[in-house]
């Protein structure tokens, strides 16, 4: 009734009140335009091993690029602040201190971009070194996800350096905040409750019961993977299949960010195979060695709809801690194509 009176001229409004009403109606229209969809990105860059400051600059540049494209969830590759193939350099206190300084800078930088993003870094906690993903949004560190499954077969020897994720989450004092530390964490957007995010790291996906399965059963509709997966014959196709399958059986979107060729300085080759899948369908993936990012629109409300149809069973899985954040997802012109006869 009030709106009708305003437009009929029966009621006068102050200019600032009119502007507030206009902005509210515009915001509602934007939400309707992108209802249920979120733009996500699996991104990487040419990493400079042990050069934390240079890698920090490249992370910032990528975030600005994604922000300009309306990407709301940005996933970087495993250990991207230092590089994955660092071997004994991970023990160096100077390197670990540089990482903390870079994370502090990213904490403040996160105020200038409209997204939640995940950055891979080594962290020393209680005297142990962990392979971690740090979540940022709106000037806050939301949580620290820890890699649980550390490969020590064939060309891998991560268990020599890193400790596996503790069995239970706990809080750590980190950069002036109490931050949740573990892998049973789901990040929930309080402004868009269907947008719930789980995180795992590389090898965690390749085991019988990945952390992302536990996170999905605790409500995560978007699962992110920070990876450094090297190339051998036939591995790219297997990687594509495992990402697709994980998204299908958990009715989730899966955002897989893979380390790029900057890691190829030892006896391993990395190609930056970024993949985004939704409910078994590959929405976007990059060509090997292209150095490009994968960006796609995922329909989280569709995923929740599918789960309500098929998730009829009871699973005995651990409970995840829920961390809330406030993010107004970016408005964008939809580009996703749908089959007329699916």
List PLM regions with ranges.
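DNA major-groove recognition helix of helix-turn-helix/homeodomain DNA-binding modules
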Residues: 15-30
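Enzyme catalytic cores with a strong preference for nitrogen-chemistry domains
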Residues: 32-342
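Recognition helix of helix-turn-helix/homeodomain-like DNA-binding domains
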Residues: 1-13
């Amino acid at each position: 009734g009030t709106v009708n009176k305003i437009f009929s001229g029966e009621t006068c409004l102050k200019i600032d009140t009119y502007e507030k009403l206009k902005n509210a109606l515009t915001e509602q229209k934007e939400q309707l335009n992108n209802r249920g969809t979120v733009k996500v990105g699996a991104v990487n860059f040419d990493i400079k091993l042990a050069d934390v400051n240079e890698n920090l600059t490249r992370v910032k540049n990528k975030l600005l690029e994604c922000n300009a494209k309306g990407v709301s969830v940005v996933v970087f590759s495993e250990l991207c602040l230092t590089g994955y193939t660092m071997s004994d350099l991970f023990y160096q206190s100077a390197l670990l201190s540089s990482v903390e300084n870079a994370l502090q800078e990213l904490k403040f930088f996160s105020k200038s971009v409209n997204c939640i993003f995940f950055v891979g870094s080594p962290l020393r906690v209680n005297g142990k070194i962990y392979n971690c993903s740090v979540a940022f949004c709106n000037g806050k560190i939301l949580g620290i996800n820890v890699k649980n499954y550390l490969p020590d077969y064939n060309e891998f020897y991560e268990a020599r350096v890193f400790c596996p994720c503790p069995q239970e989450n706990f809080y750590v004092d980190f950069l002036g905040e109490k931050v949740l530390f573990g892998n049973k964490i789901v990040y929930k957007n309080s402004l868009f409750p269907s947008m719930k995010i789980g995180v795992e790291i590389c090898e965690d996906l390749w085991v019988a019961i990945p952390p992302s399965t536990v996170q999905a059963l605790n409500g995560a509709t978007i699962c992110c993977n920070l990876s450094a997966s090297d190339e051998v014959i036939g591995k790219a196709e297997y990687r594509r299949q495992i990402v697709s399958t994980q998204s299908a059986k958990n009715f989730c979107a899966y955002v897989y960010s893979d380390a790029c060729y900057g890691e190829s300085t030892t006896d391993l080759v990395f190609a930056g195979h970024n993949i985004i899948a939704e409910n078994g369908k590959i929405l976007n993936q990059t060509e090997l060695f292209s150095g490009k990012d994968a960006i796609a629109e995922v329909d989280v409300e569709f995923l929740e709809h599918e789960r309500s149809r098929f998730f009829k069973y009871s699973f005995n899985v651990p409970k995840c801690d829920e961390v809330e954040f406030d993010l107004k997802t970016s408005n964008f012109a939809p580009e996703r194509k749908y089959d007329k006869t699916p």
